[in-house]
């Protein structure tokens, strides 16, 4: 129907429009509803086995024209949706049902009034929501009543500072429900006055609500939400991509000779990373694979510069909310080294990492797509000592990283994660045996132990709540072997590490370098 206009006939006092009966549901989906004084609408179908809200009698109006001056009775298995289509009303209830224990039926919600945006109730108008009604019974003029097992459903995004049922007095049974969709922090004034203390249910498990003096107050549980955000692993896995790139550059510059010609190199590897004991039960496990390609050249007998690109792909999974995050990470970087003496070297590197995160979860509101970026600048110094047949190379450096995470929405809640600035102090000692000749190949076994204390914004700030997210005390061990024949060098290495909050990782890589 385009417009449902209910007004009294000339020879009668009241015009009644029934919707549904004891045998079947009736459904009216109008573009506009104009309900005049002394007119009434009654909805009442019988219950059927397996009934859902889609089987209920429905009166929906995409727009309410003027004040509601007539009477509406919402009986058993019935729904009235004001300023909403029927499809949107069904979707709104299902949002609520999916986030709570509410069901539609004789043991759950038996009748509902959905107010998608505020309406005006005239002094002659009334609405009675009562799921036991099988014959018309109307509330007093100017009143809205919701009986036990009845539901008043409101879209918080459309209410703002207005009154949901303006001009009405609202009476709600203590066993009735106020349902809030698109729930977020805020207050909702339901009516000019309210009697009763209904149960408040939201479509967002991170938002709770209660009713006091006719006002619903909704509050976001930022602590719980922060734990869910940390379980996505977004910030730490962006940092891991940045760290893997930095380690690759460190290995390359440690091996290269300043005066060599153009060198091309490729590294391919993967790792398993786990964080099991973050704040608020946050945890995840990730599998990532990386491939890096770079080129460098000697520009003076003491200096060498290069550039590289790294691509990473994988996923992290958490038992919390069934979270899975499909991650792609691209890193671009520049690096250079300068030989201060034959044994001492200074290395600098710059990297930009961009990650995309495709998050899915059993809690549907956590499903999101958003990006994170890391900008890093680092410098380190190393010195080589020959002790018998072993070269020992200690190094110390400093790296500053800026981690930025895009905002995203969890239902009606906007999540802003503050940018993080961290300062890392990589300390390492590498051990390399003198070359072993084998049929024209020079074999070089090596090992490296590193410790990187981290300072700064190691926690993410989610809506004002600080949540642990980054490992600030990572320890890493590597063992590898390189084999050189002429201009080509092959390498392979295994790695393992541990850190704060039960963080641990293990992985491996292979690589090849060709010097022209």
For the regions a protein language model found, what residue spans apply to each?
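Outer-membrane translocation/initiation segment of Type V secreted surface proteins
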Residues: 8-10, 15-24, 40-50, 54-117, ...
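Short strand-loop junctions, especially beta-strand C-caps/beta-turns
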Residues: 17-19, 133, 493-497
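Fold-core signature of tandem repeat domains
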Residues: 144-146
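Membrane translocator/pore-forming domains, dominated by Gram-negative outer-membrane beta-barrels
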Residues: 224, 232, 259-516
């Amino acid at each position: 129907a385009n417009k449902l206009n209910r007004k009294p006939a000339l020879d009668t006092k009241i015009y009644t429009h029934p919707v549904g009966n004891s045998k079947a549901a009736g459904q009216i989906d109008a573009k506009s509803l104009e309900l005049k004084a002394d007119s009434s609408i009654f909805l009442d179908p019988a219950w059927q086995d397996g009934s859902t809200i889609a089987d209920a009698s429905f009166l929906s109006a995409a727009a309410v024209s003027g004040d509601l001056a007539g009477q509406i009775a919402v009986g058993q298995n019935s729904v009235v949706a004001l300023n909403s289509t029927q499809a949107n009303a069904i979707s709104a209830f299902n949002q609520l049902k999916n986030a709570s224990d509410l069901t539609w039926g004789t043991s759950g919600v038996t009748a509902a009034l959905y107010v998608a945006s505020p309406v005006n109730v005239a002094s002659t108008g009334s609405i009675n929501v009562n799921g036991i009604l099988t014959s018309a019974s109307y509330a007093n003029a100017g009143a809205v009543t919701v009986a036990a097992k009845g539901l008043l459903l409101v879209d918080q995004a459309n209410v703002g500072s207005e009154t949901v049922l303006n001009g009405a007095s609202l009476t709600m049974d203590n066993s009735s429900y106020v349902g809030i969709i698109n729930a977020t922090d805020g207050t909702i004034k339901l009516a000019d006055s309210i009697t009763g203390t209904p149960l408040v249910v939201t479509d967002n498990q991170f938002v709770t609500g209660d009713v006091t003096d006719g006002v619903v107050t909704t509050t976001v549980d930022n602590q719980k939400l922060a734990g869910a955000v940390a379980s996505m692993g977004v910030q730490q896995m962006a940092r891991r991509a940045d760290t893997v790139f930095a380690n690759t550059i460190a290995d390359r510059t440690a091996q290269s000779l300043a005066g060599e010609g153009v060198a091309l190199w490729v590294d391919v590897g993967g790792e398993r990373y786990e964080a099991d004991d973050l704040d608020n039960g946050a945890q995840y496990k990730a599998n990532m694979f990386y491939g890096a390609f770079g080129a460098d050249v000697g520009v003076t007998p003491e200096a060498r510069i290069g550039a590289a690109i790294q691509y990473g792909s994988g996923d992290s999974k958490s038992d919390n909310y069934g979270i899975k995050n499909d991650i792609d990470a691209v890193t671009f970087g520049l690096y250079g080294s300068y030989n201060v003496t034959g044994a001492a070297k200074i290395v600098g590197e710059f990297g930009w990492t961009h990650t995309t995160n495709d998050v899915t979860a059993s809690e549907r509101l956590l499903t999101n797509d958003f990006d994170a970026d890391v900008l890093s600048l680092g410098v380190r110094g190393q010195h080589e000592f020959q002790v018998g047949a072993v070269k020992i190379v200690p190094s110390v450096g400093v790296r500053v990283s800026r981690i930025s995470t895009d905002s995203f929405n969890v239902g009606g809640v906007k999540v802003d994660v503050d940018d993080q600035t961290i300062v890392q102090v990589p300390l390492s000692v590498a051990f390399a045996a003198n070359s072993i000749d084998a049929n024209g190949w020079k074999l070089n076994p090596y090992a490296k132990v590193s410790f990187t204390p981290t300072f700064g914004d190691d926690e993410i700030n989610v809506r004002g709540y600080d949540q642990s997210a980054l490992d600030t005390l990572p320890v890493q061990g590597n063992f590898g072997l390189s084999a050189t024949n002429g201009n080509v060098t092959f390498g392979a290495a295994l790695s393992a590490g541990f850190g704060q909050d039960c963080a641990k990782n293990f992985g491996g890589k292979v690589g090849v370098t060709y010097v022209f």
